Swiss-Prot record:
<dbReference type="GO" id="GO:0000287">
    <property type="term" value="F:magnesium ion binding"/>
</dbReference>
<feature type="active site">
    <location>
        <position position="329"/>
    </location>
</feature>
<feature type="binding site">
    <location>
        <position position="346"/>
    </location>
    <ligand>
        <name>substrate</name>
    </ligand>
</feature>
<dbReference type="InterPro" id="IPR002060">
    <property type="entry name" value="Squ/phyt_synthse"/>
</dbReference>
<feature type="binding site">
    <location>
        <position position="497"/>
    </location>
    <ligand>
        <name>substrate</name>
    </ligand>
</feature>
<comment type="similarity">
    <text>In the N-terminal section; belongs to the phytoene/squalene synthase family.</text>
</comment>
<dbReference type="InterPro" id="IPR019845">
    <property type="entry name" value="Squalene/phytoene_synthase_CS"/>
</dbReference>
<keyword id="KW-0511">Multifunctional enzyme</keyword>
<dbReference type="GO" id="GO:0016094">
    <property type="term" value="P:polyprenol biosynthetic process"/>
</dbReference>
<dbReference type="GO" id="GO:0033850">
    <property type="term" value="F:Z-farnesyl diphosphate synthase activity"/>
</dbReference>
<keyword id="KW-0460">Magnesium</keyword>
<dbReference type="InterPro" id="IPR008949">
    <property type="entry name" value="Isoprenoid_synthase_dom_sf"/>
</dbReference>
<feature type="binding site">
    <location>
        <position position="380"/>
    </location>
    <ligand>
        <name>substrate</name>
    </ligand>
</feature>
<keyword id="KW-0132">Cell division</keyword>
<comment type="subunit">
    <text>Homodimer.</text>
</comment>
<dbReference type="GO" id="GO:0008834">
    <property type="term" value="F:ditrans,polycis-undecaprenyl-diphosphate synthase [(2E,6E)-farnesyl-diphosphate specific] activity"/>
</dbReference>
<dbReference type="GO" id="GO:0005886">
    <property type="term" value="C:plasma membrane"/>
</dbReference>
Amino acid sequence: MVRDWSACGSLLLVMTVAKDRGGPAVAGSGGGVESPELRAAYEVCEAEARQFAVELWAAAETLPVETRPSLYAIASWSAYTDRIIDEGPLEGREERLAQWSADTLADLRAGHSSHPLRRALVDTVRRWGLAEALIEEHLDSARADCAAVPVFETFKDQRRYLRGCSGALAELWVPLLEPRGPEAFRLMSVLGEACQVADLFEDLPDDLAAGRCYLPRQDLRGLGLDVDDLRRGEREEALNAFVDAQLAHWRGLLEETVLAPSTVGARYQIFVHTLLLGAQMHFDEVTLLRSRVLTQGLESLVTGDGRMSRRAARPGPGPVPGHIAVIADGNRRWAEARGLLADQGHRAGIRAVLRLVNAAQRTGIRHVTVYMFSTENWYRSQGEVAALFGAFADWFARGAQTVHELGVRVRWSGRRDRLEESLASSFELLESMTANNDKLTLTICLDYGGREELAAAARALAAEAVAGTIRPEQIGMAEVARHLYVPEMPDVDLLVRTCEQRISNFLPWHLAYAELVFDPAPWPDFDLARLRDAVDSYAGRERRFGGDAELPAQAGNLEPARNG
């Protein structure tokens, strides 16, 4: 079947606007359409997109109001095409699809249509000067998929399907997004392919049961497998290797598409970041499941009403750290290696933080602390500091509702007197909104320095001593901890630093007995597989906490004995 690639879903809502969106965005309110019939057609498209392509509908809410109706028109037409293939009696499906295709192309030639979905599509194509050949390419792919069971010998063959099914549609959108050159068209097409791979895995059990396999047969034969082995799910080692091969293909697409946000206008980059993050989150989920995905498929990361779904943890067999802290280093190097400006690296770094939150929840980690901006980072150029805080502001504006729906409690560790007032207020509002959440605690270290934190605690204790509320001999570790930025923060079990091998003035109080893992990858490349490797390394270590006993790594519930 042809699938609506927007249903790759995952975290398409991660950076969408807050829930108080206001009324519907219909062409005419921002698009200059005066015809009542055409306005009504666009309203039908939005309703259809909201019902049958909810993830894409929600992501479109990040777009300027004049752009959304056109995206709804394309999404609703594509979803309707998909439903012709998937719904209704088997007999006559090819004929119904052929008629719908012929009517669509005839309407495009005529410049008008009596069908509301096609009427809006025709107007969108003419309004933006979209390439009708891409619509024909998509319809050709749909007809081929409807006519015969798919057999893709190689990944190259599979990519031709991915291109026709989803890449062509993604490329069709590009003129809506203020493209910055021809590369935008190619990269958006690849992003469409990457999202479609996610959708293949989501529907895999149902497709296999129906005798349809969209994965390369060459990879199967190379491991001594056939399609029946995928359905049975019994040869775990070989099946894991097969899924790993698919992940390798997919990773190549994702690595290419990380450049896509930089190729569209600034107002549209959040939309592309959202789509890319959705594909990355699904990639991480398949990494977690491996061969289990063949029989279980992928859980949707959003519910039917567009809210984030809270999925159960799937910890590995070994101990899991209760608290992981991350020095997220390498955004600038990541960007430079790809010919991008530093601000694109920082926005990719924000994506990686959201990706980490999802991965930590799935692996059973309860506390995550991320070093985002140090007291020393103020010495960077004004332009880079502004870019960093612009990325933070986007995160607060787009991600607050999502992390709240995931049950994440967000806290701020750092100085609160030097940030721009609106940014500080946004962070404090997010803290308040998520204060009662208990699925995971995410602490963001912003304008944080470890020595400054300890000095501030010392100043507060000195003031208490001068006021006579505490005597110097009464000051112990508990009293110091009471005056840290986040007094209730537990000790760190595992510290991960990307790119470099330094602690960089990070959490000196909490790192006293932490295990350290240094990952050479730049922060935007940190995914679930790298987190799993770090956790596996942690699980294999003996933690003594300064004593003689050989204690295994614990899940954050062991209070080490310290000399007072």
